[in-house]
UniProtKB/Swiss-Prot annotation:
Probable transcription factor involved in the control of specification of mesoderm and endoderm. The keyword DNA-binding applies. This is Homeobox protein SEBOX. The gene is Sebox. Keywords: Developmental protein, Differentiation, DNA-binding, Homeobox, Nucleus, Transcription, Transcription regulation.
Length: 188
């Protein structure tokens, strides 16, 4: 069976069925949407309206984006589902837990990292995870007290709980994803 676009040769002249234009989000819009999604995947109307003002998107599009993002998260967590974020080049591996030296003057930047596993040049830099490793049953609420960046306001964010949901991170993709969010918030 042909798709509606293929089945309607009159589509180019405006006679065929109308197809809704796909929304393209800018990098800034996506970063803001992902940041809020990490804190609250089910935002209330006031949060969505605030996002609409910040991103210059209609509230309805923001609501649909959150619905789609929740569906994607559920799909990614199904057993046996391939997760594109975890696909690494064959000659690349995640490093062991790095030992970091922190400069108290600049709490968000490590001075250096020593790890027993060195990355190869083909490894993308985002594969090294500098977030604390949490065991089963641990949550970010317990880890935030030991976080080197503290729990005071960072770039308008009031606490780590607003960046990262308080759930157990037994899934490696969640850990990598959360680390990227914390890193992005830290550098913004």
């Amino acid at each position: 069976m042909a798709s509606p676009v293929e089945a309607s040769p009159g589509c180019a002249s405006g006679l065929g069925p109308h197809r809704r234009k796909r929304t393209t989000f800018s990098v800034g819009q996506l970063l803001e949407l992902e940041r809020v999604f990490a804190a609250r995947p089910y935002p209330d109307i006031s949060t969505r309206e605030h996002l609409a003002q910040i991103t210059h998107l209609p509230e309805a599009k923001i609501q649909v984006w959150f619905q789609n993002r929740r569906a994607k998260r559920i799909k990614d967590r199904k057993p046996g589902a391939l997760n594109a974020r975890l696909e690494l080049p064959p000659n690349c591996s995640l490093p062991d837990t790095p030992q970091l030296s922190w400069d108290p003057g600049t709490p968000s930047h490590p001075l250096h990292s020593t790890s027993s596993a060195q990355q190869t040049s083909a490894c993308p830099p985002q594969t090294s995870c500098l977030a604390p490793i949490l065991g089963p049953g641990q949550s970010w609420s317990g880890a935030k007290a030991a976080a080197p960046w503290g729990t005071s306001e960072v770039s308008g964010v009031h606490s780590l709980e607003q960046i990262v949901p308080q759930t157990s991170l037994g899934n490696l993709s969640d850990l990598i994803y959360t680390s990227a969010i914390v890193t992005n918030v830290d550098h913004s």
